[in-house]
Amino acid sequence: MKNNKFALLAIICVFSIQSFAQKKSKKDDLVTIKTEQGTMHVILFDETPKHKANFIKLVKDKFYDGLLFHRVIEGFMIQGGDPESRDAKADVTLGKGENGYRVPAEFSPKLFHQKGALAAARDNNPAKESSGCQFYIVQGKKWNKADLAKQVARATRKVTEEQKAVYETVGGTPHLDGSYTVFGQVVDGVDVIDKITSYPRNDRDRPEKNIAMKVSVKKMKKKKITKKYHWNYQS
């Protein structure tokens, strides 16, 4: 555990040295998550540098290749990243596997659980530190004003009017805001989430069909990302 903590610290330090230059960089990291159900493209937020650096490191190390989306709940999210899920037998309960460290929580009022949000899973710890490897992607649902008000009341931080509008028109899981770190967003292939959540699952929410992933990352010009995926970078 101690060695793993030093490894995470090294990742964070390297990222911190580069962070100023990256803010002015004309390129960004584009993550590709491939499954039999389709491909998702994801951008990672500079507002969550520890999570971004950690995720990119794991992707480059091919940590996620062959792992499963082991927990799938329609109208909520798809979860993966458990290292014990690789080649796991159908009757095995998954979700407890870790890589030996946590990532400190990184909350930003600009980042929220809209549909397609990439967020870090975690256990029940008071600091809300994230799993070092497990993540989920939000499906959620669209909310009417009355039900949304109840959901927002459960959130541990203020949800803005602009964010409420997104929850009403695009969908998401507003009650998780302020409790789990959102560190990325699916910018292409959101329909893949719906395909994955449509699969039958057992009483532990594991899909009856194994849904494996292959994850890669590459640098791409921000202008190209904006043009191809309609993602607008804020200055």
Q: What residue ranges belong to the model's regions?
A:
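Bacterial Sec-dependent N-terminal signal peptides
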Residues: 1-25
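Cyclophilin-like peptidyl-prolyl cis-trans isomerases
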Residues: 19-235
